[in-house]
């Protein structure tokens, strides 16, 4: 399985266009050791030619330009992207579908709850239905594994996770199964497994076992502390209120990752306020000392 990190930041990217927090100001001025990052999305493939997008970021045009394998140039209009899987209906994971409209029809895999959001609160399926067949909806049963034509060796097992529907969702404060999923992606040729959960509000015993059984875990790294948005003065909500488990301290994701002995451990969906973006920070050093990597745009993993 080929895994390519198209974007590794949370919504707004890094630096966020209107933010002058220490991280954003520092990366703009070159006064901190940090990489510019686009909004989170990854691509996976079993042959290096045909690719599946996991989430469609608002930055998708630039991401695909930087990702040369996405353009095999076999004909006048071409792309290596054949399918899109949506983990949720968050704007930073779905607005890229609008940019992909020239490639319609496009196969889009998502749960019924995500499809409801994308035909009501943010009706992108409706908007694109006249674009050469539009978005072709394939329903994900959040309790059942599925396969995608052309990717015979890959199996996708959804996992219902605790997080939150987006603010625009008609059921923002009425959670349903399928609002957010994680994915266990198994490559039956190499017998390797990826656990992908860019939006993760809680780690329970089931998720711990799945992570231990995986060869690579790529999980939510939005915030270092639960009150980070408040402490930096950029917001009023905690991480948990937004559906994101913080990294540090008791009950943070790092305390769980440190219990894993086998898999490669990667944090993705990093908010612009998170001190781990500064590679000279104590927080980045702490992750490195615990063999936890911070995803960056262009990062590649082979399983």
UniProtKB/Swiss-Prot annotation:
Keywords carried by this UniProt record: PQQ biosynthesis, Transport
Instruction: Please describe what this protein does.
Output: May be involved in the transport of PQQ or its precursor to the periplasm.
Q: Which domain of life is it from?
A: Bacteria
Q: What is the name of this protein?
A: Coenzyme PQQ synthesis protein B
This protein's pathway reads: Cofactor biosynthesis; pyrroloquinoline quinone biosynthesis
Gene, per the UniProt record: pqqB
Q: Which family does it belong to?
A: Belongs to the PqqB family.
Source taxonomy: Bacteria, Pseudomonadati, Pseudomonadota, Gammaproteobacteria, Moraxellales
InterPro entries attached to this UniProt entry: Metallo-B-lactamas, PQQ_synth_PqqB, RibonucZ/Hydroxyglut_hydro
NCBIfam families (alphabetical): PQQ_syn_pqqB
Record-level GO BP terms: pyrroloquinoline quinone biosynthetic process
């Amino acid at each position: 399985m080929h895994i390519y990190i198209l974007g590794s930041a949370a919504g707004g990217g890094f630096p966020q266009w209107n933010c002058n927090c220490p991280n954003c100001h520092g990366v703009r001025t070159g006064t901190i050791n940090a990489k510019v990052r686009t909004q989170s999305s990854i691509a996976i493939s079993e042959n290096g030619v045909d690719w599946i997008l996991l989430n469609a970021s608002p930055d998708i045009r630039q991401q695909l330009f930087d990702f040369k394998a996405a353009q095999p140039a076999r004909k006048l209009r071409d792309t290596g992207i054949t399918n899109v899987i949506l983990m949720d209906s968050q704007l930073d994971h779905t607005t890229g579908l609008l940019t992909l409209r020239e490639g319609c029809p496009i196969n889009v895999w998502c749960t019924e709850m995500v499809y409801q959001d994308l035909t009501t609160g943010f009706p992108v399926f409706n908007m694109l239905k006249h674009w050469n067949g539009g978005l072709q909806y394939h329903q994900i049963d959040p309790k059942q594994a599925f396969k995608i034509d052309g990717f015979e060796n890959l199996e996708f097992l959804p996992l219902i996770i605790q997080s939150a529907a987006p603010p625009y969702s008609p059921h923002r404060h009425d959670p349903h199964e399928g609002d957010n999923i994680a994915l266990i992606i198994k490559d039956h040729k190499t017998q390797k497994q990826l656990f992908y959960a860019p939006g993760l509000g809680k780690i329970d015993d089931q998720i711990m076992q799945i992570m231990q059984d995986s060869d690579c875990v790529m999980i939510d790294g939005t915030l270092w502390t639960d009150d980070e948005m408040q402490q930096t003065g950029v917001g009023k909500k905690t991480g948990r209120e937004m559906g994101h488990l913080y990294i540090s301290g008791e009950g943070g994701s790092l305390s769980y990752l440190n219990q894993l002995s086998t898999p490669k451990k990667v944090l993705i969906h990093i908010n612009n306020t998170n001190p781990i973006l500064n590679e000279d920070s104590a927080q980045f050093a702490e992750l490195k000392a615990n063999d936890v990597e911070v995803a960056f745009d262009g990062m590649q993993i082979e399983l």
